[in-house]
Amino acid sequence: MQTIYTRITDIKGNLITVEAEGASLGELVQIERADGRSSYASVLRFDAKKVTLQVFGGTSGLSTGDKVVFLGRPMEVVYGDSLLGRRFNGTGKPIDNEEICFGEPIPITTPSFNPVCRIVPREMVRTNIPMIDMFNCLVKSQKIPIFSSSGENHNALLMRIAAQTDADIVIIGGMGLTFVDYSFFVEESQRLGFADKCVMFIHKAVDAPVECVLIPDMALACAERFALEQKKNVLVLLTDMTAFADALKEIAITMDQIPANRGYPGSLYSDLAVRYEKAVDIAQGGSITLISVTTMPGDDITHPVPDNTGFITEGQFYLKDNRIDPFGSLSRLKQLVIGKRTREDHGDLANALIRLYADSRKSAERMSMGFKLSNWDKKLLAFAELFETRLMSLEVNIPLEEALDIGWKILAQSFHSEEVGIKEQLIQKYWPKACLHK
């Protein structure tokens, strides 16, 4: 039963307050304005009969006499195959100039998947980016952020991952996007040929902050249905979680909440965790793998958003100098697939390459300080140049097996086989034959 109220007692920012009974948190509300227009809101807080609503699209033009209708259900988004290839805003309305999308309405605020039905991740998600596939494998159901330094083109990296992944469906949630960013997503999805298996939920920088916080929920609600009902392997890409946290902060300040670290609400950790925990590998079903972008203001890893994120997720990719930094990046689930779902030489080769690259950084530092370089230093510097060009560049698009072969070739071009610290049985099997006795 719908309840109608005609008295708005307070309007502050995108929040309004009404005197109402029987409201529930997250309940969807329709506001019918005097000029005939209507907008939606959701219940954010209530204190006895005093109910605070966050209005989608802003409160401009509202008057205290407008009708407020409690719909008795939570915010919903349409689910179905008709979503594929479509783009929606933070309220679930199409923004691609196409017809209204028909499908099953599903609530966007549901609990995390039942832990009893989860299985231990054991399958790799391929991206054809060597710095991910080879050194920090992405595993089905993993939740992992990309920590992006200022000025890094993280959107291009996301589009590369979306285009090259072997996931069945890609769902993109964009928060605080400029028009240039939004246009880039649309154009790249069409140019790279994955638009037909992609769904986009987009919040632009000019849209209301309350719509920003709904984007992850909409994306993950649809992903969960695709994984559960259609047994699809879904890759969810969220950007930018710092913009999401800033929207939470703006709403909390408007509600006069006591701020915590750097003005963010004390619930920031829980607000992030409840979204990340949607990542799941379902027994007898599909999976949800979640990659998010978290920009670091001032390259500060101790900023509340990346700091809290690091405690929730299963590693991180550190994007710096237009590369995925091998020393700041980590996948805590990679041991579940390396050598088990990949070639036997994967783990030893990756460790040797990173160890030698770390040594080359020390040699580069000695060279910059004017020290005399040894023959070993020169070998390391030559190796580093090959490694950065052929494996570290984000422009490289090769499958894992080819990346492993290239890794062996780089070692053979730079070192003797006994200098790399790899097991003799692997050397005999994988070291390029022409260089075996080098």
UniProtKB/Swiss-Prot annotation:
What is a biological process (GO) this protein takes part in?
proton motive force-driven plasma membrane ATP synthesis
InterPro entries, alphabetized: ATP-synt_VA_C (IPR055190), ATPase_F1/V1/A1_a/bsu_N (IPR004100), ATPase_F1/V1/A1_a/bsu_nucl-bd (IPR000194), P-loop_NTPase (IPR027417), V-ATPase_su_B/beta (IPR022879)
Under the heading Gene3D superfamilies, the entry gives: 3.40.50.12240
| Entry keywords, A to Z | ATP synthesis, Hydrogen ion transport, Ion transport, Transport
A molecular function (GO) held by this record is:
ATP binding
Family matches, as NCBIfam families: PRK02118.1, PRK04196.1
Query: Tell me, what does this protein do in biology?
Result: Produces ATP from ADP in the presence of a proton gradient across the membrane. The V-type beta chain is a regulatory subunit.
Give the family, as the similarity comment puts it.
Belongs to the ATPase alpha/beta chains family.
What's the protein here called? V-type ATP synthase beta chain
The record lists the organism as Chlamydia muridarum (strain MoPn / Nigg)
Task: Please name the gene that encodes this protein.
Answer: atpB
